[in-house]
């Protein structure tokens, strides 16, 4: 059987928004300056990388980044890349009320419409953290796919709503929490699985307030780990989705750009590989796996 391996770069432009919403740098001019590097220096470097190898990419952009870096946003759109939603200030969905989460989502959609001329079809939850109603909000507002959940790794699937589970409460009797997870109802929302082991940020970005922050792991080690994953996928699977999550904060650094060049060149040696946007992955999955009505 011929191989069909869809490969994609998802670029999360956390930039200043990441420090405001997730990384604990909201009071640090130095950390904010690192966010400015991501937007002003990092984005053009990644665009140059993609242009060199003729690759499409999907950029998941917080609203804050859209409004803070208008020149760089125009460069992304002019290059023909896809733009998806990624919060406004990289807010944690779990920490917000339902109204706050919906307001942020609607603002993100509005800004992307103004930027690209069309509504986004895809969403990435900041910090890959879903609230109990994120699924429902995405469905309500017409999103086609999400890239935040991890039920699978290299195969898309339809998102469920209504999963429930019992948390442990040691003030109760054990029988009160000893219950299995209950699966909810499948929806039309396509999940393109997220994968912490194909994300550049945790191992290669130093964050002062994060207790498990690294930032100094060699890109040679990370690049080999990503290549090893691709090699296994290519050996074991005829159809698969291999999506890599990167950030201009990290992957625009010289040592990491060289890592990506090696990864791209390795992947390109294989037959049956196709570089695509996330929207193309979702459309391909929908054709392969139409839902039964």
Curated annotation (Swiss-Prot):
GO terms for molecular function: acetylxylan esterase activity; hydrolase activity, acting on carbon-nitrogen (but not peptide) bonds; metal ion binding. Residues 29-276 form the NodB homology domain. Pfam families: Polysacc_deac_1. One of its GO terms (biological process) is cell wall organization. It is an enzyme of class 3 (hydrolase). InterPro entries: Glyco_hydro/deAcase_b/a-brl, NODB_dom, PgdA-like. Catalyzes the N-deacetylation of peptidoglycan (PG), an important mechanism that appears to confer lysozyme resistance and to mitigate host immune detection; this likely contributes to pathogen persistence in the host. The exact nature of the residue in PG that is deacetylated has not been determined. Is also able to catalyze the deacetylation of acetylated xylan, and, to a lesser extent, that of chitin and chitosan. Therefore, this enzyme might play a role during infection, considering that xylan-containing carbohydrate structures are among those commonly consumed by humans. Belongs to the polysaccharide deacetylase family. This is Peptidoglycan deacetylase. It comes from Helicobacter pylori (strain G27). The lineage of its organism: Bacteria, Pseudomonadati, Campylobacterota, Epsilonproteobacteria, Campylobacterales.
